[in-house]
Amino acid sequence: MNLKPLGDRIVIKILEAEEKTESGIVLPEKAKEKPQEGEVVAVGSGKTLDDGSKVEPEVKAGDKVVYSKFAGNEVEVDGEEYLIMRQDDILAVIE
């Protein structure tokens, strides 16, 4: 993958949505919810503030995260789907 995010942007590999419900019902492709979890694969240098100082990113490559439902822009690279989003769209790190 050759995506290098700029500023406070982060590249996330989308984790697949569940194929079955908890009760075992197999979901058709159209019924699946858009996933909101992913793995950070690349991080920009951070946000530059008006005074010129820089805020370092709070996540790093390899972190599993939860992000806002409609966050980011989808891109496809080498057959893999990724999201590019701002750090503010990440809600939590899964530990």
UniProtKB/Swiss-Prot annotation:
PROSITE patterns reported in the protein's UniProt record: CHAPERONINS_CPN10
Primary localization: cytoplasm
Protein keywords: Chaperone, Cytoplasm
Claim: Chaperone is one of the keywords in the record: yes
GO CC terms, sorted: cytoplasm
Annotated region described as Disordered, given as residue ranges: 36-55
InterPro entries according to UniProt: Chaperonin_GroES (IPR020818), Chaperonin_GroES_sf (IPR037124), Chaprnonin_Cpn10_CS (IPR018369), GroES-like_sf (IPR011032)
Disulphide linkage map: none
GO molecular function: ATP binding; metal ion binding; protein folding chaperone; protein-folding chaperone binding; unfolded protein binding
Pfam family, one: Cpn10
UniProt-annotated location(s): Cytoplasm
UniProt record, GO biological process: chaperone cofactor-dependent protein refolding
Matching CDD domains: cpn10
Domain of life where this protein originates: Bacteria
Membrane-spanning segments: none
Chaperone as UniProt keyword: yes
Subunit and partners: Heptamer of 7 subunits arranged in a ring. Interacts with the chaperonin GroEL.
Recorded family membership: Belongs to the GroES chaperonin family.
Its job: Together with the chaperonin GroEL, plays an essential role in assisting protein folding. The GroEL-GroES system forms a nano-cage that allows encapsulation of the non-native substrate proteins and provides a physical environment optimized to promote and accelerate protein folding. GroES binds to the apical surface of the GroEL ring, thereby capping the opening of the GroEL channel.
Classification via NCBIfam families: PRK00364.1-2, PRK00364.2-2, PRK00364.2-4, PRK00364.2-5
UniProt-recorded name of the protein: Co-chaperonin GroES
Organism, as annotated: Natranaerobius thermophilus (strain ATCC BAA-1301 / DSM 18059 / JW/NM-WN-LF)
